[in-house]
């Protein structure tokens, strides 16, 4: 795995001096976040992710592209596994869930490596601790603290899940209470956009519609994505104003289920059951953003895979990769 070479490296510089050079690394893996435009053209009454689209159009100190993931419509934990360990699901049996089957002891991973450099490493997920065995797995990957739903006091909800806006509030809270001079690594897995998308709710009214399509799930999904886009803008806007060097990474774990995607495919002469191999690959693409509040080489259209993304993050963070 790419990250194995990072494990156990000796840091021969003065630790306090080194810590100050290291940027905070804030990672948001956003539940079901994707840009369905990769599947084909469609027209909405308003842009469903205007902020992310603006970042893709050549924003300063920003790297954007599409991430190839190994899951579609579910199995979030596998994208987590690929990002955090640098391992690929391609080398594991079909149907595997590494969190539940293979991680039984400490293994080389991004949080463990960052912890060895002096980072405070925090995983946060506003749902139940035992989901995908995260409460057991996170410490084995090197997280010093794990925060779950029971610690999201006073959080706002969208439908029946903690909102992305409240996830951003939690990240800001973690940053503001951290030890000064100690770099912070936060890995946030959101819940707001979790399927299904057919029920109605008193606390959420979908407002994005697709021309020529009547689909409650699609409208609800795109409206949720719009809220995620607003939360991303809030997160980056906050760190634009902070003094400490900080890098923000944002990506989706997978596309939504076929119920959401089918109308877009149908508009473009496809169905979920008749996709060619190349068309099916499009169902495994999600957008990603790497943004920094300091100078990095901006790049758009830089496509990669979930298991390579952490190495890119370390590169832009100025952390040795060999």
Positions of predicted regions on the chain:
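Solvent-exposed soluble domains appended to multi-pass membrane proteins
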Residues: 5-23, 27-30, 34-322
């Amino acid at each position: 795995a790419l990250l194995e070479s990072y494990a156990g490296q000796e840091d021969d510089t003065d630790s306090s001096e080194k810590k100050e050079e290291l940027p905070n690394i804030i990672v948001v893996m956003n539940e079901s976040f994707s840009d369905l435009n990769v599947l084909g053209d469609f027209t909405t009454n308003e842009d469903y992710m205007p902020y992310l689209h603006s970042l893709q159009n050549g924003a300063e100190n920003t790297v954007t592209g599409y991430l190839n993931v190994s899951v579609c419509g579910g199995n979030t934990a596998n994208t987590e596994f690929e990002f955090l360990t640098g391992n690929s699901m391609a080398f594991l049996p079909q149907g595997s869930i590494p969190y539940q089957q293979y991680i039984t002891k400490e293994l080389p991973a991004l949080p463990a490596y960052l912890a060895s450099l002096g980072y405070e490493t925090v995983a946060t997920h506003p749902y139940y601790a035992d989901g995908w065995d995260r409460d057991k797995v996170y410490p084995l990957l090197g997280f010093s603290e794990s925060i779950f739903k029971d610690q999201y006091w006073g959080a706002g909800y969208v439908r029946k899940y903690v909102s992305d806006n409240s996830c951003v509030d939690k990240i800001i809270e973690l940053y503001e209470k951290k030890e000064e001079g100690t770099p912070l690594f936060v890995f946030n897995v959101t819940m707001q956009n979790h399927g299904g998308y057919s029920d109605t709710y008193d606390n959420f009214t979908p407002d994005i519609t697709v021309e020529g399509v009547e689909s409650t799930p699609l409208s609800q999904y795109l409206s949720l994505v719009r809220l995620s886009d607003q939360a991303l803008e809030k997160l980056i806007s906050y760190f634009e104003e902070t003094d400490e060097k900080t890098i923000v990474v944002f990506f989706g774990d997978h596309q939504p289920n076929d119920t959401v995607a089918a109308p877009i495919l149908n508009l473009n002469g496809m169905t979920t059951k008749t996709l060619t191999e190349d068309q099916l690959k499009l169902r495994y693409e999600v957008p990603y953003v790497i943004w920094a509040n300091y100078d990095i080489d901006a790049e758009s259209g830089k496509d990669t895979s979930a298991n390579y993304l952490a190495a890119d993050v370390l590169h832009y963070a100025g952390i040795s990769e060999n």
